[in-house]
Amino acid sequence: MWLLPLVLTSLASSATWAGQPASPPVVDTAQGRVLGKYVSLEGLAQPVAVFLGVPFAKPPLGSLRFAPPQPAEPWSFVKNTTSYPPMCCQDPVVEQMTSDLFTNGKERLTLEFSEDCLYLNIYTPADLTKRGRLPVMVWIHGGGLVLGGAPMYDGVVLAAHENVVVVAIQYRLGIWGFFSTGDEHSRGNWGHLDQVAALHWVQENIANFGGDPGSVTIFGESAGGESVSVLVLSPLAKNLFHRAISESGVALTVALVRKDMKAAAKQIAVLAGCKTTTSAVFVHCLRQKSEDELLDLTLKMKFLTLDFHGDQRESHPFLPTVVDGVLLPKMPEEILAEKDFNTVPYIVGINKQEFGWLLPTMMGFPLSEGKLDQKTATSLLWKSYPIANIPEELTPVATDKYLGGTDDPVKKKDLFLDLMGDVVFGVPSVTVARQHRDAGAPTYMYEFQYRPSFSSDKKPKTVIGDHGDEIFSVFGFPLLKGDAPEEEVSLSKTVMKFWANFARSGNPNGEGLPHWPMYDQEEGYLQIGVNTQAAKRLKGEEVAFWNDLLSKEAAKKPPKIKHAEL
């Protein structure tokens, strides 16, 4: 375990502490009793009971490293669940950066990181003396499957304002969560199996917290949105949830889902000094490594950073979801085409400028000069192969389509970032929404178009709807900020209402809200921003262009299959 002071939101600290019951909440779970705390928000009579760090699985240590999660051990005392759990192991420096961006904290908390991290946080506005049945919203955080944690997302405001039970879960990340040898010795997808285990825990226990196990909505952003999308496709998650929301990430996001990751496993073996005579030997070697040794290995892998100098086909900036035959039986494209998945009501959305600032900055795109010529853009698109998956021979055609209409190098840079946003998020999201709709499930789409007042000073003022920007609205941060503009407070209330209405009924619409059309053959969607309004055919032309380009390419040549043996 290691410590790092992180600037995090302790949203509860902004709350006033009036009107809560005299004694703190104690709730029974299948494993034992847990003690929480009450948090009251100004202007709202009903306090929220908060339980932080409730274990939903056994610590994944020793022989449970690279293994499916096991049920938590029971305890006979009252467990104190009033402080944040450790976050799963990850690069602490990069996590510091992202936490600073995604939380509005004034208070510096010392956060722990540990391999023992399978905990969840519960925020319930229910009167625990009565048997309430409130809708449950289970949040899966983002971070490229290598970063993040539940403490960054305080569910108090959403729970209090919308009368829903919010659960923020954690799951193993990086090597701990997604290391795969492609065989039975380490299938991978451990982090997703943790998510499934958390959903089982919710089914078994959430009624005691005033939640309805028959009304569970899973929602997540970025890799959390991709996780939601994977769970929609997974037979293991059947009947564990009833509605789903993917914000800026789906199972067709190329960087996050691969058939196998044997090539990355090979790289890990070399860096770890492990023999790979057999998978069993390799996995045994990695299980012997200490937590710190695996962290050191994580730093050497340089996750989330694109290599703009080496061979991008040999670079592994992500340890993604893999086809393991269990959680994910086939590639998402096949499962979607066969219409064989959990056809629950589904909201799929993207932000207006997914590659506006945060992602190119984190991934190390050389754009500091703020301008770009066509040749460099074409080269950058090819260097982005691990996340864009565009064959080298198509890169000039693509950059010409997007950048060819202007000679202004500043505009070219902006258009290149639009191209990246479309390839990585826009096109996959629309494709998933269409397939979901065609399988007969109620589907809704949105595009978020607002620049939060929380935005980093470093982010150019022109960037509106950057990756992650909707999170502030979804969790009601502006309602606690005090000095947030009125339009932002109003927008946040609208977004929370849409999300919670959807959690209640599978339809986001309700009294006093702009109409959000269902995503049908006309492809109506909602533009969410200062002027929230319906529009049609989100990214329609762009999707047509990319589908046409990639299908022509696929028809031209037989697929090359490259095997990396372990």
UniProtKB/Swiss-Prot annotation:
Active site, UniProt feature: S222, E354, H467
A Gene Ontology cellular-component term: lipid droplet
Glycosylation sites: N80
Activity-pH behavior: Optimum pH is 8.0 with tributylglycerol as substrate, and 8.2 with retinyl palmitate as substrate. Active from pH 4.5-9.5 with retinyl palmitate as substrate.
Cystine pairs: C88-C117, C274-C285
Enzyme class label: hydrolase
Gene Ontology BP term (one): lipid catabolic process
Predominant place of localization: endoplasmic reticulum
GO molecular function, one term: carboxylesterase activity
Modified residues (Phosphoserine): S379
Motif segment (Prevents secretion from ER): 563-566
Pfam families the record matches: COesterase
Catalytic reactions of this protein: a carboxylic ester + H2O = an alcohol + a carboxylate + H(+)
Activity regulation, short description: Activated by CHAPS at concentrations of up to 130 mM, higher concentrations reduce activity. In the presence of CHAPS, activity is stimulated by non-ionic detergents. Inhibited by the esterase inhibitors diisopropylfluorophosphate and phenylmethylsulfonyl fluoride.
Compartment(s) where it occurs, according to its Swiss-Prot or TrEMBL record: Endoplasmic reticulum lumen
Residues spanning the signal sequence: 1-18
UniProt-listed Enzyme Commission number(s): 3.1.1.1
Keywords attached to this entry: Disulfide bond, Endoplasmic reticulum, Glycoprotein, Hydrolase, Phosphoprotein, Serine esterase, Signal
The family this protein is said to belong to: Belongs to the type-B carboxylesterase/lipase family.
Role: Involved in the detoxification of xenobiotics and in the activation of ester and amide prodrugs. Active towards triacylglycerides containing short-chain fatty acids from C2 to C6, and 1(3)-monoacylglycerols containing fatty acids from C2 to C12. Inactive on long-chain triacylglycerols and diacylglycerol. Hydrolyzes aromatic and alkyl esters and vitamin A acetate. The hydrolysis rate depends upon the amino acid promoiety and the esterification site of the prodrug.
Record protein name field: Liver carboxylesterase
Organism listed in the record: Sus scrofa (Pig)
